[in-house]
From Swiss-Prot:
Cellular component annotations (GO), alphabetically ordered: cytosol; eukaryotic 43S preinitiation complex; eukaryotic translation initiation factor 2 complex; multi-eIF complex
Biological process annotations from GO: axon midline choice point recognition; cytoplasmic translational initiation; formation of translation preinitiation complex; response to endoplasmic reticulum stress; translational initiation
Keyword terms, alphabetized: Cytoplasm, Initiation factor, Metal-binding, Phosphoprotein, Protein biosynthesis, Zinc, Zinc-finger
Assembly: Eukaryotic translation initiation factor 2 eIF2 is a heterotrimeric complex composed of an alpha, a beta and a gamma subunit.
Family that this chain belongs to: Belongs to the eIF-2-beta/eIF-5 family.
Name of the gene encoding the protein in the UniProt record: eIF2beta
Molecular function terms, GO-annotated: mRNA binding; translation initiation factor activity; translation initiation factor binding; zinc ion binding
Zinc finger (C4-type) boundaries: 260-284
Region (Disordered), start-end ranges: 26-104, 125-146
UniProt name for this protein: Eukaryotic translation initiation factor 2 subunit 2
Chain positions found as Phosphoserine: 44, 133
Keyword Metal-binding: yes
Compositionally biased spans, kind Acidic residues: 90-102, 125-142
């Protein structure tokens, strides 16, 4: 068979090398390719096997087996390996880089947590400092509103400033309560048929913090009569008067000579300068002059006869 056909095993090797490719699909599908070979190749392979059996050479038999396994040649596989080996190496290196990146990320995350804690502490500290600075600025604004400003203030601003000072000096007014001046009602008694006794005159004068003489002059001038103090410190007034009349006179006296004309505070002092009286307020500090006491109309009854006699 070998002599007739003239097949050489070396030629078979060359033919197989020509048919083999570097493609893995071809390497994996060698079994299918061997099935699709020509019948002449199968016949030559059978002839070669017969010749090998005749020679009974173990070494050549072993070589023939290697020749059959030649499609799985290591040279071809090594030639194909580098194209895939580089990818495999790159693929193997990428997870290492990812692991390194992950480690770096974890470390950075830990640092960020620490930095967040520090940032929170710094934020709280900054907020506390800001609150303190704002409180100080508010205190400075309240204490020195006019400091460091040259502009002209509006009427509303000035009015607001005045009311703020009044509220600072009078905390009772901050709650919407005006200071009320409480005074005892006058005790008026009838003395005979033509005189009236003002029993608690001295007590009212002490309550108003005024001199009894000044109050007496105003009372007699407003009532248009005369009167004097007796031994029991009671005011005896000529004429018949009702308690309501005495109370109205006292109200006018308090409004004019006791309460402040600015803040209506009863905490005032009546001072005399030369011929004028000045009302000094201890609450708001205002100072204003008051009218002098003038005697009103007085009826002349006892002297009319003498006057008429002189004229006639």
């Amino acid at each position: 068979m070998d002599a007739e056909d003239g097949f050489d095993p070396t030629l078979l090797k060359k033919k197989k090398k020509k048919k083999t490719t570097f493609d893995l699909d071809a390497a994996l599908g060698l079994e299918d390719d061997t099935k699709k070979e020509d019948p002449q190749d199968e016949a030559s392979a059978e002839g070669g096997a017969a010749a090998e059996e005749d020679n009974l050479d173990l070494e050549s038999f072993g070589k023939k087996k290697k020749k059959k396994k030649k499609p799985f040649n290591m040279d071809e596989i090594e030639a194909a390996i580098p194209s895939f080996g580089g990818d495999d190496v790159a693929a193997s290196e990428e997870p290492e880089e990812e692991e390194i990146n992950l480690d770096m990320d974890f470390s950075m995350a830990k640092k960020k947590k620490k930095s967040k804690k520090k940032e929170l502490d710094e934020l709280f500290a900054d907020q506390a400092d800001d609150d303190k600075s704002e409180d100080k600025e508010n205190d400075e604004d309240n204490s020195s509103t006019w400091f460091g400003s040259d502009r002209d203030y509006t009427y509303d601003e000035l009015l607001k400033r005045v009311f703020e000072i009044i509220l600072d000096k009078n905390p009772d007014m901050a709650a919407g309560r005006k200071p009320k001046f409480v005074m005892r009602p006058p005790q008026v008694l009838r003395v005979g048929t033509k005189k009236t006794s003002f029993a608690n005159f001295m007590d009212i004068a002490k309550t108003l913090h005024r001199l009894p003489k000044h109050l007496l002059d105003f009372l007699l001038a407003e009532l248009g009569t005369s009167g004097s103090m007796d031994g029991n410190q009671q005011l005896i007034i000529k004429g018949r008067f009702q308690p309501k009349q005495i109370e109205n006179v006292l109200r006018r006296y308090i409004k004019e000579y006791v309460t402040c004309h600015t803040c209506r505070s009863p905490e005032t002092i009546l001072q005399k300068d030369t011929r004028l009286f000045f009302l000094q307020c201890e609450s708001c500090g205002s100072r204003c002059s008051v009218a002098s006491i003038k005697s009103g109309f007085q009826a002349v009854t006892g002297k009319r006869a003498a006057i008429r006699a002189k004229t006639t």
